[in-house]
A protein has these predicted regions:
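Cytosolic C-terminal regulatory domains/tails of membrane transporters and channels
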Residues: 1-85, 89, 533-659
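Transmembrane helical cores of multi-pass ion-transport proteins
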Residues: 2-534
């Protein structure tokens, strides 16, 4: 609040004082009751008001350019501190404290996650519509980068089912070049969002919208893998299109693929249950014996490594059939051996379409990727933050740092021909239960993937496609969040609306439109909530027996809500015909529209000769209202002052009474 406005306010107080006391009055409001604190206007520094009142003296206003320079200087200075360096490069915090116990925990967890990510990477590349090797290419370099910049020890960077499906819909059969460029652009956008502190954007994705989106994605992924379980060819951009394509080709179902796929799903679900088997005393107070501990660890290891075990066993079966001739089921086929070539992502692309050479530059490729460039970074962040919160154990999650870490990991992956990735919730659970201590566990995961690329790719040829489809289906079926419906129904039924709308929209429309619809519905709920504040109405009586109406809004006055509040105030004031007090204790902000409506409201009350007072109005809000100089605008801060105000309502023009 500027000095000019305060001087104007003191002049009004002086004028009001003379009206109350006459020309011979002194420097105080002598007519007021003893419970009201006096106001000395002789000296500015003796002004005493509400405890919330802050007077700021500012003789020289900085120009816009100077303000920007000052802001930039503060940002640069804060970015160049040791604290900021440790915040943006978290490895500097935990590496000096690293010891042998951490090394053992990270080694066990890293190898366990590596055994999980290799079959998943092969399967997720199928979801993305890419050859199998691209899933492995996406699974090692990002792990190394996340070790340096990642802030959560449980996050294993790599391909995920959701990112793979979004990549498939964005690339739309354009080929690996577009997927690699998408990975690079995703990383660039995530780093920029982190630099500008835009991690808060995920706050607009509520729990119901996230649950609806995740459940729809799970069903779409399951549907996309049914074709490999049945051994048929089917495709589709949406859930409905895929099912239509499946029914069209259902008569070509291959028996061996179907039997093999269904059997693999059953085995995986059974092996998943093995992790929950506990041998030993059921009494929690009795510690298990060493034998029981070893057996439980063995069961846990078998259940956790189920994907790798199944791939090895089915690979041997596939090899046996191939050695004796053509296998009765479809296999992955040739996977190029060795590490990928380290090179920049493709910024142009040339294709040979039936003898016609077609060239695309960067802008053409970006146009092909369309909204995927925006959606995939946000969804990747949403996945990553969900993991960080799940395993944070009450610690704060730095969304900005996670944006930077995941973005740099995706940029690195694009240089080794990877497609977009993020933190995987299933692998994070494995990582956490394996006893990971620091992000260095990703080192062993990445090394295991590199070893697989160097030495085991010839054996991937024999893995049945139905086995990989079974791995995906058995994993994502638990992503369908049916369990959240009942709690939503019990707590707030209206939350089901954005959740169900997102779920249906994602199934019928492309995923990016589905989640935008969900967010849009959420924002409508928020805006409606802001536009319809709750107002309590009380009919009270002052100490002197004068009745008045107390109206208490429960939130800020901003443009969507002010007309609604004005109509309610007018309605109740006309109906009762007594003085009105608006309790502003919960009003922490206002805008120009609110000031305009308050001005009209005071004019209406003055025209009806009906007193209107504002109680406990924050000085910052009061200055907004006073900007339009409303008529008979009276603010007070002490309950006892209402008697004096009601007694002197006929002669008060504008004043502020302070505690």
């Amino acid at each position: 609040m500027h000095l000019e406005n305060d001087n104007h306010r003191f002049m009004n107080i002086m004028k009001t004082e003379r009206d109350l006391q006459g020309e011979g009055g002194g420097g105080t409001l002598g007519n007021l009751s003893t419970s009201t604190t006096s106001v000395d206007i002789d000296r500015l520094d003796q002004f005493k008001g509400s405890n919330d009142f802050i007077l700021v003296e500012e003789n020289n206003r900085s120009s816009t350019t100077q303000a920007i320079k000052s802001w930039a200087k503060r940002k640069v200075n804060s970015a160049c501190t040791r604290k900021m360096l440790h915040r943006r490069v978290p490895i500097l915090n935990w590496l000096p404290k690293y010891d042998s116990s951490c090394a053992v925990g990270d080694l066990v967890a890293g190898i366990t996650v590596g055994l999980t990510v290799i079959p998943q990477a092969l399967a997720y590349s199928n979801i993305a519509g890419l050859p199998a090797q691209y899933g492995l290419y996406s699974s090692f370099l990002g792990c190394f980068v996340y070790i340096i910049f990642g802030s959560c020890k449980d996050v294993p960077m790599g391909p995920t089912a959701i990112a793979a499906l979004l990549t498939y819909q964005a690339v739309n059969s354009k080929g690996p070049a577009h997927a690699i460029l998408l990975c690079f652009l995703t990383g660039i956008l995530q780093v920029l969002m982190g630099f500008f502190g835009l991690g808060f954007l995920i706050d607009f994705v509520s729990g119901p919208v996230s649950s609806g989106f995740t459940s729809a994605v799970a069903l779409i992924i399951i549907t996309s893998q049914i074709k490999d379980v049945l051994g048929i060819s089917a495709s589709g951009a949406t859930f409905v299109d895929t099912w239509r394509s499946l029914f069209k080709d259902i008569h070509n179902t291959r028996t061996w693929d179907t039997v093999f796929g269904v059997a693999c799903i059953a085995v995986l679900l059974i092996m998943r249950l093995i992790t929950k088997v506990k041998v030993g005393p059921s009494d929690t107070d009795t510690p298990p014996s060493k034998f029981h501990t070893v057996v439980n660890k063995f069961f846990w290891l078998i259940g956790t490594s189920r994907n790798a075990i199944l791939v090895v066993v089915c690979g041997f079966i596939g090899y046996s059939f191939c050695a004796n001739g053509e296998p009765p089921f479809r296999v992955i086929g040739y996977v190029p051996p060795g590490l990928p070539t380290v090179q920049p992502p493709p910024f142009s692309h040339t294709t040979n379409n039936n003898g016609t050479v077609e060239s695309e530059d960067l802008l053409d490729m970006m146009a092909d990727l369309s909204s995927g460039i925006i959606v995939i970074p946000l969804i990747g962040l949403l996945e990553d933050i969900a993991i960080c919160k799940a395993f944070a154990n009450g610690k704060a999650v730095d969304a900005t740092q996670e944006l930077i870490a995941v973005g740099l990991s995706n940029i690195a992956n694009s240089f080794v021909q990877g497609f977009p990735g993020a933190g995987s919730l299933s692998r994070s659970a494995v990582n956490n239960s394996s006893g990971v201590r620091t992000p260095l566990g990703g080192l062993y995961t990445g090394i295991l993937v590199i070893l697989a690329l160097l030495f085991f790719t010839p054996y991937f040829y024999y893995i049945p496609k139905s086995t990989l489809a079974a791995i995906i289906i058995a994993a994502v079926i638990f992503m369908v969040e049916v369990k959240v419906v009942k709690p939503m129904w019990r707590t707030k039924k209206s939350d089901l609306i954005p959740g169900v709308a997102t779920f249906i929209a994602c199934l019928v429309l492309p995923l990016e439109y589905g989640i935008l619809i969900g967010i849009g519905i959420n924002l409508m709920f928020i805006l409606y909530h802001a536009a319809r504040p709750k107002i309590s109405v009380e009919k009270l009586t002052s100490h002197e027996g004068v009745e008045y109406l107390m109206l208490t809004p429960d939130r800020c006055l901003i443009f969507p809500s002010v007309d609604y509040v004005r109509n309610l105030v007018t309605k109740h004031s006309i109906r009762q015909g007594i003085p009105v007090v608006i309790d502003c204790s919960h009003i922490y902000g206002a805008d120009y529209t609110a000031a305009t409506v308050i001005e009209i409201l005071t004019q209406d009350f003055a025209a009806r000769d009906q007193p209107l007072f504002f109680y406990n109005l924050k000085p910052s809000v009061s200055s907004v209202f006073e900007g339009l100089s409303p008529k008979e605008f009276v603010v007070y801060y002490n309950h006892e002052d209402i008697d004096e105000l009601l007694r002197n309502k006929s002669c008060i023009k504008k004043q502020i009474l302070n505690v």
